[in-house]
Amino acid sequence: MSSPDARDARSPSPRPRSPSPAAPSRSWSRSRHESPSRSPAPMRERREEEGNEQRSPRQIAHHPRSPRGSDRRAEPRRRDAGGGGGDKYRPAKARKQRSPPPAATEEQKQAAAKAEYERLLTARSGGTYVPPARLRALQAQITDKTSMAYQRMAWDALKKSINGLINKVNVSNIKPLVPELFNENLVRGRGLFCQSAIKAQAASLPFTPIYAALVAVVNTKLPQVGELLLRRLVLRFRKAFRRNDKAVCLSATTFVAHLVNQQVAHEMVAGQMLLLLLNKPTDDSVEIAVGLTREVGQFLEEMNAAIANVVFDRFRDILHEADIAKRTQYMIEVLFQTRKDRFKDNPAIRDELDLVEEDDQIKHFVELDGELDAQDGLNIFKFDPEYEENEEKYKKLKAEILGEGSDYEDDSDDEGSDSSDDEPAAAEQKAMDIQDRSNADLVALRRTIYLTLMSSMDPEEAVHKLMKINLPQGLEGELPSLVVESCAQERTYSKFYGAIGERLAKINRLWTDLFEKSFEHYYTSIHRYETNRLRNIARFFGHMFSSDAIGWHCLSVIHLNEEETTSASRIFIKILFQEISEAMGMPKLHTRTKDAALQPYMEGLFPRDTARNIRFSINYFTSIGMGVLTEDSREFLQNMPKPALPAPPPDSDSESSSSYSSYTGSSYSRSRSPSPRRRSYSRSRSRSVTPRRTNSNGRNNARSPSRSVSRSISRSRSPAPIRGRSYSRSVSRSRSRSYSRSVSRSPTPPRRQAPAQQRGRQRSYTPSDRSRSRSYSRSRSPRGRSYTRSPDRAGPQASTAPRSGGPPRKAGSVDNRSPLSRSPSGSRSPSPRRRRDSPSRSPVRDRESGGRAAAAAPGNSEARRGRSYSRSPSRTRSPSPAPSRRRRRDSSSDASAPRKRRRESSR
């Protein structure tokens, strides 16, 4: 039975009765067959619904319900309006309201979040898709680090991060990506790292060198990671080799080869793989071995040539004996050609991937057939009871690897954290910049310039290509230097390089200055080059000077003198000026050297400082056929003032004046100042009366050697400044020209000749004046000569050789004229001891020079050629040295005097 409330709720409010006659019967039938508790409203609604089903939707849309019916359903009429739901029979009961659910605690929320997270991760389908916002919300609710859910969440984040970093590594970003990789816990995730690296390498073999370089960097700090990766690769190779899986074998061997190149794996690992592959050769195994050898061959040749030789010998045997396909044979032949080319297309390590110093690398050796543990359990998540302690340990290790101030924020999605991370990353990148001191950039630049020069057909093309080369700042001087060096290495000079230098210098002032500096550099270091290179360099710069590509003021670095030049520099100057004269012509070159604006820069080539340097320059240019350039120097040398006379020495008691000679020294009579070449002191007196005709056997006993300083006193009564000449065939060693002045007091007869009846003939001329005077001679003796037709009869002592024992020299009778001798004849001294009929009135030799002629000893030694002029015969009383040997002298014998310095005075 339904309650009255239910009936009221289902039945609408009563309607007024219909006036139609059928209404009572319809009402009676309902009341007759139905329970009185049911309301007729449901029947009407059912009929209306059946009618609506028969009608179309459009008809339903345009068939509005009766507003009276809707009003009845919306607001049913109740008897008790204040009761809230009753009918006219019973009042409505009070409604029960539900109590709110109790608030969940924090523990309950954590538990619910963990349960939901576990349900999502452990679902049978592998985990349903969870929107990122909901996943982050779930993760944010899990904050307990000791819980498995939190560690599982951190493990998933670590896996995604390592996998993402390995997948995006390339040559350009490998350096900044290394710190990001170390920011992840690679000790906990070393299995994930190895797994991701192997998968990424197998998917893209051309990127194997990049992955190997990344592993090499990690291996320097975490060697256990590199060792684990090597063990897994070896196990992967062994499994694939047994299964005949060529693709896996190829990827594993390629990765191992590049790890060997990076010195992560020992070269014996690659050697074992090669020997295993070539033990029973098949087409696939030989192909894999060829690929492995191509990658690791250069490293084996350099580090362990024995392994390389064994492997290539095995390849040679396979090529000749094994039954393999033509394609495989061709691969082996190509491999041998690659080895012949020194693996130039397969370098061991590319320059941009050489990130680790050789000393920092750690090698791992793994036996190919040994017991290896892949540690596959590191690939899956495991709960760590000491999670926080292990994380703190890795943070300390990370600080040691990256530095104290290089920690990275975990939240990479936050823009603020990203901007704050940029500064430490930039600092770390700056700290990791490697200073390349191997000059690799310089070598590459010089190679580029050289190849550009060699590949050009003409100078215009070469200059056009050279101008396109991007020269780093500070290395602009390499271009002129390499042009000169390329020119120098040619067998003969090529105008190709001269034209290049000329065009470069005329394009920009920068190149002009650089070529001028190059000229100075090469001139100062020209002695380091061989003759052929020196010639090419000189001709190159000769072309530059002749074409006015560089300024002539550069010639100021040349100082043409004996002290500052070498044989190489003199050859360089010669070839330089010959090239300039051939290009310009001698008249233009002469005009250029006489240019007034260039004279300050030509002082080194044509010096004006000393006579010696001027003569050196004149002789140099004359010897190379360019004497016309030295006309001004010759004129300057002729008009060059002579230097002042040197002051007499303070210990000289000479009464006569001394004169200057530019080539030889001076001798002073009555002085103790020595002459420049040979020095001795002697004093001789001569007293002779010269008759009008005398036959005398003159004896000259002189002990003074050549260049002696003599003191002689002659007395005559009449001064007779008349020139006289004495000729003697015995030439003394003292080459002196003596000038003497004397006043004679004795009468001097006129000159007279008589045949000499002595062994030595003398001929002298004395004036006819009679004078008596005491004279002091002043002698200047550069190269005096005395000529006699026979030597003096100086007794047995004079006919002996001097003490010096010098070898005799051939005499030459040269007629050399000397200045006047103004010593008067007719002295008071007696005549010589031996007299013969002599055609001369004065058998005297060079009395004024201290008995130099008297010191002439027989022999063939060359004596100093001198002329003496005297007007009276004299006999010197200075004793001659003791004879060392006697020798018969003829009419053309020469006298030699000892070179030893002796001072001896005898009166």
UniProtKB/Swiss-Prot annotation:
Residues 655-674, 687-731, 753-772, 817-830, 869-879 have a biased composition (Low complexity). One of its GO terms (molecular function) is RNA binding. The keyword NAD does not apply. It is found in: Cytoplasm; Nucleus. Residues 406-425 have a biased composition (Acidic residues). GO terms for cellular component: catalytic step 2 spliceosome; cytoplasm. It comes from Pyricularia oryzae (strain 70-15 / ATCC MYA-4617 / FGSC 8958). Residues 1-114, 405-433, 639-907 are annotated as: Disordered. The keyword Flavoprotein does not apply. This is Pre-mRNA-splicing factor CWC22. It comes from the Eukaryota. Residues 444-560 form the MI domain. Residues 675-686, 773-783, 898-907 have a biased composition (Basic residues). GO terms for biological process: mRNA splicing, via spliceosome. InterPro entries: ARM-type_fold, CWC22_splicing_factor, Initiation_fac_eIF4g_MI, MIF4G-like_typ-3. Pfam families: MA3, MIF4G. Keywords: Cytoplasm, mRNA processing, mRNA splicing, Nucleus, Spliceosome. Belongs to the CWC22 family. Associated with the spliceosome. Residues 1-10, 43-56, 68-81, 837-850 have a biased composition (Basic and acidic residues). Involved in pre-mRNA splicing. Residues 159-342 form the MIF4G domain. Residues 13-22 have a biased composition (Pro residues).
